[in-house]
Amino acid sequence: MFCVQCEQTIRTPAGNGCSYAQGMCGKTAETSDLQDLLIAALQGLSAWAVKAREYGIINHDVDSFAPRAFFSTLTNVNFDSPRIVGYAREAIALREALKAQCLAVDANARVDNPMADLQLVSDDLGELQRQAAEFTPNKDKAAIGENILGLRLLCLYGLKGAAAYMEHAHVLGQYDNDIYAQYHKIMAWLGTWPADMNALLECSMEIGQMNFKVMSILDAGETGKYGHPTPTQVNVKATAGKCILISGHDLKDLYNLLEQTEGTGVNVYTHGEMLPAHGYPELRKFKHLVGNYGSGWQNQQVEFARFPGPIVMTSNCIIDPTVSAYDDRIWTRSIVGWPGVRHLDGDDFSAVITQAQQMAGFPYSEIPHLITVGFGRQTLLGAADTLIDLVSREKLRHIFLLGGCDGARGERHYFTDFATIVPDDCLILTLACGKYRFNKLEFGDIEGLPRLVDAGQCNDAYSAIILAVTLAEKLGCGVNDLPLSLVLSWFEQKAIVILLTLLSLGVKNIVTGPTAPGFLTPDLLAVLNEKFGLRSITTVEEDMKQLLSA
């Protein structure tokens, strides 16, 4: 096992990365190794997808499957080894079908890629794990050095984050051939184990630029189906009655669940990154979508144990449900998996609803505590002139984009402390689950404009980017000249690709934490600092002073 893709990876003087019987996320060595094997199979599939496009062959089954299967290897998504192997087998079957299509056009069709003809050696998981050792990401570290390995992983993990967003967009009916062609090209190239530093740096920026397009079609999919989010108050306390909790990012799953629970007497609560769903008109119209439950994903083993109903996980993040013994009432969807946990293969939630009706539910309603979400792209753009007016009248001094992932590390209290000392004449724009560090605190307003503005899920960084570009255009300056600072927390690969997206768009002087990614060496961090001004957090007071004076 070697995995260094998330923020909580093991760090030692001898090197970074989880390389024992089990990773910090709870992933076993077996599952981790089989995910490496799956990635190799997907790289071979992408190699043939690139070749097929040369002949004008576009296989939509391949295009929809490849990013979805890659998504299953993202942190805290799928811990189920047999399902990972199933994805690998499907990747190889699709590859062979695509290869046959190519050969039907050109009998001499060939692909020069070491993954292009990969076959699984056995049905036995142990044998497959041994085969996977051939594809462990650091297998040639001694030959290429830590810097090249780090850049490879930056590209691989960034592309993995983009693949997750591609899957979210695809679920909503969004497809862009140019994006998929670019994805396959990059995925196939990474399967050649590239070792050119400049080429890898360029690839990381290409991934960022591609992901901006992905976020654009995801935004179109969400707003096209469910309307543009508008400011909405959400209750974060319990309401009496039967209940289901739904977590993750998949708004379509939430919509289907709301449709199927309507009239059943079962209330639905969002959790984690599903919180922004309350801002969408076509979702909040369901009166039994009664609130949001819990805090950051890392607290789920305590909070899920207390929830008196079933739980549905639609995407990341799931952690071991057996520890607090709620594994009999947690359900997985789509690419999510945990051994022994029931999986929903389709859109039918009737078994979950039946279970909810058989459980006690909340016995009484708690005193409501309302927070506000729903500052989507359209709402933010509508406020652009107000923001400019407040700045011109010196009522608004600075905007802090304070968001990103949450996690268990104690140093993450930095983001709570930072939010609480933001001056009263400054605004906090937040997104993703890092908001749970401070989104239940009171921040007041500036002439009626809330000082805490929740823009949505992690992918809604797109809305923040569009707002920044709009403000810069109206003020006749560059984005980096705005009174705007980005203080981002990271945990997994979606955050990595958001960072690459920002850097590829030329955004500079981003501050990140709580730690630097374990796969980035001091040399690579120095390069990113020199090129983009990217740096790690220090102390709340010092960072605030520096950002306000910039």
UniProtKB/Swiss-Prot annotation:
Q: What family does this belong to?
A: Belongs to the HCP family.
- What are its GO biological-process terms? response to hydrogen peroxide
Transmembrane region positions?
none
One Pfam family name is Prismane
List cofactor names only. [2Fe-2S] cluster; hybrid [4Fe-2O-2S] cluster
**Protein purpose:** Catalyzes the reduction of hydroxylamine to form NH(3) and H(2)O.
Q: What is this protein called?
A: Hydroxylamine reductase
Q: Where does it reside?
A: Cytoplasm
Signal peptide residues on this chain, from the entry's feature table: none
Using the UniProt record, name the top-level EC class of this enzyme in a single word.
oxidoreductase
What's the EC number here?
1.7.99.1
What keywords appear on the UniProt entry?
Answer: 2Fe-2S, Cytoplasm, Iron, Iron-sulfur, Metal-binding, Oxidoreductase
Catalytic reactions of this protein: A + NH4(+) + H2O = hydroxylamine + AH2 + H(+)
One term of GO molecular function? hydroxylamine reductase activity
- Gene Ontology CC annotation, any one: cytoplasm
> What gene is it encoded by?
hcp
